[in-house]
Structure formats: structure tokens, C-alpha cells
A protein has these predicted regions:
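Binuclear metal-dependent phosphoesterase catalytic core
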Residues: 1-5, 22, 82-86, 162-165, ...
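N-terminal active-site segment of His-dependent metallophosphoesterases
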Residues: 1-51, 128-132
Length: 223
């Protein structure tokens, strides 16, 4: 846990018994937001939002249905959006690399276009005095930061450009399941001042609050 400001429960890829039971409300005590990095059943997300008492923000993974096929009730999509609520400014991109033609799979070129759209919205918000996101949320990792060499689990180079341009304190992703020796060393990587965390399963984190958030506490907006 980082000695910072806003307590967040981040989840991804694996349904965990500790979060899918009567003890969730006490386990998530003090959590101000839940962030899902994808590939979780909608009913699981709906359970977590109900019993944690915190808003849930999500992106879709390569095993999630396409956007037109529905969405988890009560949850807020981050895909290509910036959502600000209290001490959080969240930006997100759904999907993994294209490998089988399924939903939420993108080539590097396609993800670059999606990242450009998101980056333009971030810049527009910054010009309006709303500051940049303190958390980026994706399903796939950035290229070379916690990814693997196979086509499915290779990260996106477009994400590196987002890190270099916007310098978020924290980048959360899932997709790459953690197992085998050295798991702890593979969960957290970094690029510059950005800490990149693979939240596969779950992680409780404390997120740095952006300077502009203190003036808009309790508000919620999206671009």
C-alpha cells in the first residue's frame, strides 16, 4: 500500500472468494472506489458494487462481451473517457492485442487511434483547468511493462506514449495472470515516475489525489 490519499480496491481477471462473500463489506472498509481492469463476470462486478458501497469503474477485457452486448448494472465505463469523482481522475482503455478476432481485441494501429482520442480528451480537460488523470486503467499492460512475448499478452506501445505525455502517478492493468516464482517482482513495474501495477486478482491501493480534486470534492464528470 502506498502512503498517499484515496483508497481504491482494484480487481481483475480472477474471481476471488475473499471478495465474493459476506466479509466483503468489512474487507473493503474505507474503500472510496472500486476499479476493474476487465475479464470479470458482470454479476461479480454487480456484487462488489452492492456490498462494498463504493462506486465501480471498469474497462473491458478480451473475454468480456462487446459493448453493444450489455454492461454491468450500476457500474461506470472508463473506455476512452476521463471520469472525475472526488479525489480521483480516472482515464481508461478497454481491450487486448488482436489475436483471434474476438471482441475487445485491437491491433497496435487501432489502439493508437483509441489512445489518441483519449489523449485529446485529457488535454481538453487540462486546458479547462481540470488537471490530468491520476490513474490510468487498462486491461492490457503497456509494452515491456509486465507483459509477455506471445501475441495475446504483449502490451501496447501506444500506452507508453500516454505515460510519457501525461505522466500519471499510477497505471493499473490486468490480463497477464501471475503465477510461478517471482510473482511479487512482476506485479509492479515503472516507467519514469509512473508506477505500473498488475492487479490480477485484487489489490488495495492508495492513489495520489490530484491538486485540482480538492476544489471539486464530491463532483463527478466525464468526457
Amino acid at each position: 500500500m502506498y502512503d498517499l490519499d484515496v483508497k481504491v480496491l482494484a480487481i481483475s481477471d480472477v474471481v476471488e472468494p475473499v471478495l465474493y462473500g459476506a466479509g466483503l463489506s468489512s474487507y473493503a472498509d474505507g474503500v472510496e472506489a472500486v476499479v476493474s481492469c476487465g475479464d470479470l463476470p458482470f454479476e461479480y462486478l454487480e456484487y462488489v458494487i452492492t456490498f462494498s458501497g463504493a462506486p465501480l469503474y471498469y474497462v473491458r477485457g478480451n473475454h468480456d462481451p462487446a459493448e453493444e452486448k450489455g454492461a454491468p448494472a450500476g457500474c461506470i465505463s472508463l473506455d476512452r473517457r476521463v471520469v472525475r469523482a472526488g479525489g480521483l481522475a480516472l482515464a481508461g482503455l478497454s481491450g487486448s492485442r488482436w489475436y483471434s478476432g474476438g471482441p475487445n481485441q485491437y491491433t497496435e494501429r487501432a489502439m493508437r487511434r483509441r489512445a489518441h482520442t483519449l489523449s485529446a480528451r485529457i488535454s481538453l480537460g487540462a486546458l479547462g483547468g481540470r488537471g490530468k488523470p491520476n490513474v490510468f486503467v487498462t486491461h492490457a499492460p503497456p509494452c515491456g511493462l509486465g507483459d509477455r512475448e506471445d501475441q495475446c499478452h504483449k502490451g501496447f506501445e501506444a500506452f507508453l506514449s500516454l505515460i510519457d505525455r501525461h505522466k500519471p502517478p499510477l497505471w493499473l492493468h490486468g490480463h497477464v495472470h501471475l503465477y510461478g516464482p517471482g510473482v511479487a517482482n512482476r506485479r509492479v513495474t515503472s516507467r519514469g515516475t509512473t508506477r505500473v501495477v498488475n492487479v490480477c486478482g485484487h489489490q488495495i491501493l492508495e492513489v495520489p489525489e490530484p491538486e485540482t480534486a480538492r476544489g471539486v470534492a464530491g463532483s463527478k464528470s466525464g468526457l
